[in-house]
Amino acid sequence: MDIRAAEISAILKEQIQNFGREAEVSEVGQVLSVGDGIARVYGLDNVQAGEMVEFENGTRGMALNLEIDNVGVVIFGSDRDIKEGQTVKRTGAIVDVPVGRGLLGRVVDALGNPIDGKGPIEATERRRVDVKAPGIIPRKSVHEPMQTGLKAIDALIPIGRGQRELIIGDRQTGKTAVALDAILNQKPLNVAGAPESQKLYCVYVAVGQKRSTVAQFVKVLEEQGALEYSIVVAATASDPAPMQFLAPFAGTAMGEYFRDNGMHALIIHDDLSKQAVAYRQMSLLLRRPPGREAYPGDVFYLHSRLLERAAKLNDENGAGSLTALPVIETQANDVSAYIPTNVISITDGQIFLESDLFYQGIRPAVNVGLSVSRVGSSAQIKAMKQVAGKIKGELAQYRELAAFAQFGSDLDASTQKLLNRGARLTELLKQSQFSPLKVEEQVVVIYAGTNGYLDNLPLNKVREFEAGFLLAMRTQHQDLLDTIRTSKELSKDSIANLTKALDAFAKSFA
């Protein structure tokens, strides 16, 4: 046997080169323990925070806790079939969802999978659910109105495109009803052939609600013809906590597609209290230290990074916008609890709904004194500013006097007049569900209220007067409504014509 020196040196070199190279346990891990929707996984050394991983049975999860010797994974689905010792694969992708127009008219879960039985989603693009919000430079101040069709809100607490306005109140105070009316009111803007700058696409995120409630909501959207410009993201009460935590982020990513492409979108998170509860559950199971009310320390950051993504972009960035209406449920009207105060401080104002008002029949049950819109007034059209400026002051005076009036019966004429006017304005701001009003119709109705046309009417005739007057305006004075809509202000001529129309109608109504 011939031994060549060159061969020996080559073998030795190869062995020296490979010396000390152990096999890396990085791309595949092993389940150490599993329970309560959380898996502890050994291995996966190079996994990224927020990365999607896949278990042996195809169930997916998200790596949240990266510790020295193991990874804490939250499971998107049931953990029943996951057992100790099973393998876990990295996917290499951060959690993302499909986005685009293909989602309009569909109901999806928090991962963007269709749950409405209408076949697969036709999406051309996928986006990460958790991305950084736009910085200061790409933004522009809010200046275009986002009409909800509700007089109490559009007149007193106006919302602009790109604003974050919180809807807060106890259970059963009509929070979802306000959000639903806001979606339905966008129908005239989303007609075929309308310019993109006018349209407003809607994303509704249902977190921790009953399936029957979500089904009812979708049915209403369908019946009213609003589903075609809406996306519904549902993580219901029976879904695992990670899905409820993820749904608002997924919905925001879908809304951002429109914002970043020069279009306008509205996202409604219904509701963020349930998302916070789901996040608390996940955090405690992952053994993160609890803080106030057992919420983790970063629950403020959870909501701030979510809501900061709603923005109005400047013209260089396409001038798109994403408006957010987060919903928070309070317990016994306690606005000073942890999550409500957090979200109030993040948003640009709040619409405060009160159960007492709701039971008095004032619906929408907006407490005008506690509700504010910090940026919306610059988005309000001039015509509405002209008529609504008065109503706010008069209602504030009315509330103050109404408290005193309970104690004394001998009131002077001016006080009596103010109380009279306030009661009628309160009556005027009532509105039935599914009957949103166009902004020009709101303007003429509020003009009638602030100019004394309702003062001598019995309270129970105010709604009747309003309905009759609107019918008269639509049938005989449509040109005046069109003028207000196009010019967006009440000129001297418009005011003269409106006064004439009101005088004529008031005579015939009496």
UniProtKB/Swiss-Prot annotation:
Upper classification of the organism: Bacteria, Pseudomonadati, Pseudomonadota, Alphaproteobacteria, Hyphomicrobiales
Membrane topology: Peripheral membrane protein
Entry protein name: ATP synthase subunit alpha
Family: Belongs to the ATPase alpha/beta chains family.
GO molecular function, one term: proton-transporting ATP synthase activity, rotational mechanism
Keyword match Protein biosynthesis: no
Site label Required for activity, positions: 371
InterPro entries: ATP_synth_asu-like_sf, ATP_synth_asu_C, ATP_synth_asu_C_sf, ATP_synth_F1_a_nt-bd_dom, ATP_synth_F1_asu, ATPase_a/bsu_AS, ATPase_F1/V1/A1_a/bsu_N, ATPase_F1/V1/A1_a/bsu_N_sf
Pfam family, one: ATP-synt_ab
